[in-house]
Regions:
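AMP-forming adenylation/ATP pyrophosphatase catalytic core
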Residues: 1-102
Length: 102
């Protein structure tokens, strides 16, 4: 488990950028060159930190999202676990979904 966490941290450090003002992560295309487990855990961690929720989205939904990203099947914004996920050129943006509780 420690070795997987090492590669998850390494993947996040090397292949993502965080913009604090917009609470947004930008993932480059090398993010998805890792093993499936590393991608899954990295994406789960990023979505959990952006959305601010205690629980992350269901595993099956995250797996489906990873498949769509790898096959370039994301055409518009996708919402998952309180986050917007969208593909722009060769990068993926993960930002917080605006809540309607006002």
């Amino acid at each position: 488990d420690q070795s997987i966490n090492f590669y998850v941290k390494k993947n996040i450090d090397q292949n993502t950028r965080f913009f604090n003002k917009k609470n947004t992560f930008i993932l480059n295309n090398f993010f998805f060159d890792q093993s499936h487990e590393v991608i899954f855990r990295s994406l789960s961690f990023l979505m959990k930190s952006v959305s601010g929720k205690y629980y992350v989205a269901r595993g099956k939904s995250i797996n489906d999202l990873i498949k769509k990203i790898k096959l370039n099947k994301i055409s518009t914004k996708v919402t998952l676990g309180g986050c917007f996920v969208e593909k722009i050129n060769e990068t993926i943006l993960i930002s917080r979904e605006k809540s309607s509780k006002t």
